[in-house]
């Protein structure tokens, strides 16, 4: 799978990422490094522990990384969750977390396929 094909699969912004990260080669390396990013695991732990500060921090980090890498769907869902958690409430956050998890799982499956090709 090509980098462009990966972005087509996930509904991401290939053009923006390759422009911002200067080259397709560098963008490819950064995208694959996302497999080691711990922000989703931190978010999951914080949500389970009902630790609002850690959940907000992890959601905010995940949002930023996803947006910088052009992971449009994950960036949007993480941004929505971030805004709910910003006001220091879990009200409505569980449904948004499930959307983030779904977007993350889809992205990781596509990313593993890209990394193996």
Model-predicted segments: where are they?
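Two-component system phosphorelay core
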Residues: 1-57, 61-117
